């Protein structure tokens, strides 16, 4: 059942944000809870990070205790695998009893599912905890790679690109993209990025695009006729740095954990992360040197939100909605922000929370390597999803796949 505390949070949030009361009536949500009790959510989510896997396992225990919902984490190498599964079911005429109940998603995968009618909803704006979401202060929670979410996915974490470095080996990191290029070419083998189409590798390419394009505002529009001219400076930049990358760019790390391990092993001096708290979490776990810190480039770095979405033919829609709402609980958001757990940034409007929840966030030690919100600087909006798709294709055509 809905607790008094939940309704207190909803009322306070609505008042603080100037919103109407949540559209979910108690009876409506109670019927969702009743239906969800005893269901198993098959959550298809990236499984490449042990810390995230542990968090999902912990969340499953919470869902079981609070709502009688079991979470089965289907660990993905690529979100596209889950999208392909749902698409295949749609093409086969399977409109019910789908294999996927919930997907960790954003960007081009959300765009593809929304375009093909593969999503259930809108549901996110109907969740009891939705009024706690910082829609005004964090527009990325309702706009995914320029595409309005329209309630078809629910946010659960914020991310922003940061660079990690070891102060013992690099006292002063480069502050601009041009300075980074100069540093890379002057220090052969000490930098690399994950191999596209890995999301972090593509994020690095998009960050470079922001810095070298004549008119970066074009990134907010779908790829057009000017694409070749727009991206020419990107390929020129990569052509300059690739000979100086780790292993002379004959191989690339597979993903963010593999990239971070290179920094941990002192094989590289500068790394990347899409989680500003990752370095602090790894230091706390003893996996990174205590001298590691983070920095961002002048002018800002790319940021976005992570979401969960429910396929149109999900077998357990009620339980999936319960998990989506649970992810927005303040105490769970605070746990995710703890650098000892994940170090993710919250999607909530902290000013709208009850004092006890505000204190929980305020009491978090974000870690020695985590930049303050002010130091993180401006967030650059994700480009339209079509840029990500086209750049990944062209990167492979130009540089091939490492073996």
Feature map (PLM): residue ranges:
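N-terminal export signals
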Residues: 6-25
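Extracytoplasmic/periplasmic substrate-binding proteins
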Residues: 246-309, 313, 359
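Mature extracytoplasmic/periplasmic domains
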Residues: 301, 306-375
């Amino acid at each position: 059942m809905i607790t008094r505390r939940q309704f207190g949070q909803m009322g306070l949030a609505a008042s603080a944000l100037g919103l109407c009361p949540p559209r979910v009536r108690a009876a409506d949500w109670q019927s969702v809870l009743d239906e969800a009790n005893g269901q198993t959510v098959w959550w298809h989510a990236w499984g490449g990070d042990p810390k995230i896997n542990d968090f999902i396992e912990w969340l499953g225990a919470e869902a079981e205790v609070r709502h009688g919902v079991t979470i089965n984490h289907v660990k993905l190498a690529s979100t596209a695998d889950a999208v392909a599964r749902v698409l295949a079911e749609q093409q086969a005429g399977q409109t019910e009893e789908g294999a996927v109940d919930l997907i960790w998603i954003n960007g081009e995968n959300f765009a593809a599912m929304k375009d093909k009618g593969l999503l259930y909803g809108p549901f996110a704006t109907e969740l009891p905890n939705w009024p706690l979401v910082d829609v005004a202060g964090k527009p990325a929670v309702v706009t995914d790679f320029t595409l309005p979410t329209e309630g078809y996915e629910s946010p659960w974490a914020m991310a922003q690109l940061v660079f990690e470095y070891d102060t013992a080996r690099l006292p002063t990191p480069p502050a601009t993209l041009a300075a980074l290029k100069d540093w890379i070419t002057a220090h052969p083998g000490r930098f690399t990025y994950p191999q596209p189409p890995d999301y972090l590798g593509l994020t690095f390419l998009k960050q470079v695009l922001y810095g070298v394009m004549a008119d970066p505002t074009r990134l907010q529009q779908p790829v057009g006729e000017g694409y070749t001219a727009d991206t020419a400076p990107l390929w020129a930049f990569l052509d300059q740095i690739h000979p100086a990358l780790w292993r002379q760019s004959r191989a690339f790390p597979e993903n963010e954990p593999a990239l971070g391990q290179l920094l941990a092993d002192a094989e590289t001096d500068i790394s990347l992360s899409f989680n500003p708290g990752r370095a602090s979490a790894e230091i706390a776990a003893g996996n990174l040197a205590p001298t590691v810190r983070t920095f961002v480039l002048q002018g800002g770095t790319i940021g976005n939100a992570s979401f969960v979405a429910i396929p149109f033919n999900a077998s357990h829609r009620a339980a999936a909605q319960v998990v989506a709402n649970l992810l927005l609980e303040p105490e769970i958001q605070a746990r995710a922000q703890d650098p000892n757990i994940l170090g993710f940034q919250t999607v909530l409007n902290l000013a709208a929370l009850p004092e006890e929840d505000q204190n929980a966030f305020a009491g978090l030690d974000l870690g020695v390597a985590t930049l303050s919100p002010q130091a993180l600087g401006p967030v650059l909006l994700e480009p339209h999803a079509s840029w990500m798709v086209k750049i990944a294709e062209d990167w492979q055509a130009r540089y091939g796949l490492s073996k």
